[in-house]
Swiss-Prot record:
NCBIfam families: PRK05330.1 (NF003727). One of its GO terms (cellular component) is nucleus. One of its GO terms (molecular function) is protein homodimerization activity. This is Probable oxygen-dependent coproporphyrinogen-III oxidase. The active site is at H118 (proton donor). The gene is hem13.
Length: 312
């Protein structure tokens, strides 16, 4: 018999997100030249997290890389919503114990030539009243440019496809399509950006296999995003470009407060940490009545957000 003891997945995920958080913060600080403010917080029985935030940076107008490790009991409303995707959840329970560990990041650059980006990876488990554990992974990463550079979209998607392919060749086509559907701003009838990968309620393989997949994807972010930022952060732009960026930021805010699952879950949790949950919102955004894009490069983005394309 082997003497090797494998840590519970929840503990492995906790360590991973804390490591990835500091890795990403260091990588983005190298791009910006300004440090992130790191705010460690605690909550309830052993719950804690670290909010790493940059605001009014040299390159990044606003951004945050947050981790949270929380446990407690889900209220009946949250339990009911989760039952839709998990048949095994106890239908008679009014509340259930849960554990969640996740990392969430949104970065809004100053320069409209540089894309906003988002990342989220999480592990969730519930314990039914009979003691049975129900678990799943969720997450993904996506790119939201204002000015579309096809080479950036190809690079970002290519690296995430390679990460997916190392674990299951069906993952990228499935999760790319899922991202296109999930990031749809329904009332606008267009997507938030140019997608990436997205998955949720993922429990179809051994948990250790899925953890390895999530770990690979999480470490893919910096090489997928930093080269794009280095090319775009100092490019010249016009007032029209900036106006278009602010309009797109408004769309971003609409999606996050109306449709984003993480925002909804965070605000439903007992005593939500609102500052961290709403960290995803841009510092500045704009809504103009009957706005029409003025330049062809702005219209080029809309072709892709209205009809998502294959990038690789």
């Amino acid at each position: 018999m082997s003497d090797i003891t494998v840590e519970p997945i929840g503990k492995q995920m906790e360590k991973l997100i804390l490591d990835v958080q500091q890795e990403i913060v260091a990588g983005l600080e190298a791009v910006d030249g300004q440090k992130f403010f790191q705010d460690k917080w605690t909550k309830g029985e052993g719950g804690y997290g670290i909010s790493c935030v940059i605001q009014d940076g040299n390159v990044f107008e606003k951004g945050g890389v947050n981790t949270s490790i929380v446990q407690g009991k889900l209220n009946q409303d949250a339990v009911q919503r989760m039952r839709a995707n998990h048949e095994g959840i106890d239908r008679t329970a009014k509340e259930l114990p849960f554990f969640a560990a996740g990392i969430s990041m949104v970065i809004h650059p100053r320069n409209p030539m540089a894309p906003t980006t988002h990342l989220n990876y999480r592990y969730f488990e519930l314990v039914n009243s009979d003691g049975k554990k129900i678990w799943w992974f969720g997450g993904g990463a996506d790119l939201t440019p204002s000015i579309l550079f096809e080479e950036d979209g190809k690079h970002f998607h290519k690296l995430h496809k390679e990460a997916c392919d190392r674990h299951d060749p069906t993952f990228y086509p499935r999760f790319k399509k899922w991202a296109d559907e999930y990031f749809l701003i329904k009332h606008r009838k267009e997507t938030r950006g140019i997608g990436g990968i997205f998955f949720d309620d993922l429990s179809e393989k051994d948990p250790q296999e899925l953890f390895a997949f999530v770990k690979d994807c999480a470490h893919t972010f910096l090489p997928a995003y930093v080269p794009i930022m280095e090319k775009r952060k100092n490019m010249e732009f016009t007032e029209d470009d900036k106006e278009f960026q602010l309009i797109r930021r408004g769309y971003y805010a609409e999606f996050n407060v109306m449709y984003d699952r993480g925002t909804w879950f965070g605000l439903q949790a007992p005593e939500p940490r609102v500052e961290s949950i709403l960290m995803t919102l841009p510092l500045h955004a704009s809504w103009r009545y009957k706005y029409e894009p003025k330049q062809e490069r702005h219209k080029a983005l809309l072709k892709v957000t209205h009809t998502p394309i294959e990038w690789c």
